[in-house]
UniProtKB/Swiss-Prot annotation:
GO biological process terms held by the UniProt record: defense response
GO cellular component, one term: extracellular region
Domain of life: Eukaryota
Compartments (UniProt record): Secreted, Cell wall
Organism from which the protein derives: Pinus halepensis
Main location: secreted
Keywords: Antimicrobial, Cell wall, Plant defense, Secreted
Protein name stated in the entry: Antimicrobial peptide 1
Amino acid sequence: FSGSVNQACSGFGWK
């Protein structure tokens, strides 16, 4: 993930 979805990734625990 990268860009605006960065925050979403953190919530799901992905990188």
